[in-house]
Amino acid sequence: MLALPKFSYCMKHHYIKFFGTALIILSTVTLFAQTGKGTISGNVVDSLGNSIPFANIQVKKQNLKTTSGKTGAFKLTDVPAGNQQIKVSITGYDQFEQVVSVIANDTIQVNIVLKEQRSELNDVIVSASRRPESLSQTPSSVTVLTAKELNTQSAISPNLANILSYSVPGLGFSTNQTGNSGQTLRGRNVLVLIDGIPQSTPLRAGGRDIRSIDPSVIERVEVIKGATAIYGNGAEGGLINYITKKADKGKSFGGYSQAGITGNLKGDSTIGYRFSQQLYGKTGKFDYLVSGMFEKTGVFRDAEGLVISPEYGLGETKSYNGFVKLGYNFTPKQRLQVMYNYFSSRQHSKYLTKEGVYGQSPAIGIYGKRLGEDEGTRFNHNANLQYTNQQIFGKTDLTANLYYQDFYTIYSNSASFFGSGQSAITSTKKGARVNLNTPFNIADQVPMQLNYGLDLMNDKTAQSLTDGRLWVPNMNMVNFAPYLQASATFINDLTIKGGLRVENINIDVDDFNTLATGANGAGSIAVQGGKLNYNALVFNAGARYSKFKFFNPFISYAQSFSVFELGRVLRAAKSNTLSQLETKPIIVNNYEAGFSSTVGKLNFSAAYYYSTSKLGANLLEVNGTYISQRIPERVYGFEIQADYQVLRDLSIGGNYAQVEGKGDVDDDGNFNGEKDVYLNTTRIPPSKTTVYLKYSGIKNLSLDVNWMRVGNRDRFKTNAAGKYLIGEGPVKAFNLFNVAAVYQVTQPLKLSVGVENLLNKVYYPAISQFYGSNVNYVRGNGRRFNLSLGYAF
């Protein structure tokens, strides 16, 4: 029998010490693993494996959050060990949540696949109330263009006017020119913003505000439809807010490079090229994004290969965009950020315009030397300094902005006045915005938000001729406006909103002389300048009920305030004192009702609106130039939109918008009298239908096909000379097809191909038709391609 060894007391003591020490070490390691900190990293992609940048990733119940980078990569450090629930969200995709087991001193890799969101009601916007809110709580019509949608449309054309016309119901068709005259929103003027900085020049509307920045630096576009005063002067039909990209906080250094070529498929000298470069990252508390873009277009030709008239054309144009955004996080709740953007677009054409015959043959370009200054926007500078504090006191958060905008553009030669000449608009804006938001409960289960603050802006605008003559005098406007918005949610589903804004506007107008009508100053009127003071209290109210997905209704009433086109009134002055001119403001009352619906795979929405103003600003042609017709106006219309998921990889959708407007010339309250008129087509666009098809059934490939139909509008007769006045020419319907294909070659490498006017249709844009003149009877683009290659690193 085997004898077991006998342990001495000393040996037993050593074993006890050994096992005791091991147990302590093991317990310590286990405890540290449970209480230490680890890292979560990974990538955010869509169902095709395409990277999703700027997705918001946060650890629930922890004050930890970050944003995915351009390649979809992200990293969360100092995450407490144990089971942690992460939440990932971004506009356009369903929210994603997952429990992750975090181990101390270790990195957990998580790959996140987001499903494209079919309902827009979960989108979060900031432009409607100047605070984050979901569309399901917004009692108004809103269109949001996500980064993905911008990228798809940019693959066809980087012209923002084109992108928006295909994407926004109620917005007029693009002009295919440098400007956006006639591209109104719901039949009224739209206020365009870049990160809340006004781009529009309502004192002397120049029609250069939609194309005022390059889409490569835009993260998303928010379009608020219907009159609003939330951002101040000029939003009679609504507002368009370009929200610029954020710095990538997922890595210390990264970038995106893109190069491409463009051109027509018929005719020579059409090839152009485009380059853009972005660098971004985060180091400690500092983050940055720097971007540059250069584009040179070739000759633009129509479907028959004819050179499109260079008058305000986009052919042979050089465009530049420089963008910088720097941010510093003092604490997780305090941030200072500075943004600067430079945009310039100038035409250098070797062609002259040869007039067409209205209704018969197009105006085209012929070889020749153009005299005078090159047309285009010389510069558009925008700078914004923003400070945010998510808890400045109590539960109140603060956003404060100082901004600056400087704009200068030159127009083509005009013969509408004696001596002819080229005009230029200059506009400089300086402003401050202070916005506070305080949440609280007014009763059990009744949360409320108070949003309040102050806007201050100085706008100096003038219009001169390049030969030194003054057409519109310097107008120096100071706008001081406190505001208050309140929002309460009852029984979790009924949101009621209301607000007011007090407008205080003072405008100093210099003494000036109107342009002469003959030699030696004949016909010029010396007008004594002075001060114009405007004060108004404007309101908004609305309600939305979001309990049922199949029926989510809203109603709203909103006012806007606008000192619009004062410059046109001044330059057409027939009196020698300011007080004798019609300079009253435009106050618009907008009434709207609509609903959104989700039933299975179908999304559907509709809205009807009706807006009135006692004094409008319908532009009327007199002796070849515009004057403002100050008469009561009514504008009304409706919009419908539908999307349907046919298969997992196939969806279709579309929208239809129609608007009409009338003016009460004799001011008798009856808009259907013999003297009353339809508002011309510079204001009221023809009906517009768009249909899209999206297919992603082939690995790494997405395909988008778009169809647009611009309808008829024929409301006016010719004058005694048998000609149409500007804005009154009949518009005949036309149809266009575009297609975009994006192929993810590798994870960092992407190939994009877009074709505009796929069927090479001969057509005249709406502006070419309603202008009713030989020189403006210009065809739209023939079949054009846009081929680009992008690389993320």
Q: Each predicted region: which residue ranges?
A:
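A beta-strand signature from Gram-negative outer-membrane beta-barrel systems
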Residues: 215-256, 792
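Transmembrane beta-barrel wall of Gram-negative outer-membrane proteins
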Residues: 268-297, 302, 306-350, 442, ...
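Extracytoplasmic beta-strand/coil segments of soluble accessory domains associated
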Residues: 161-201, 219
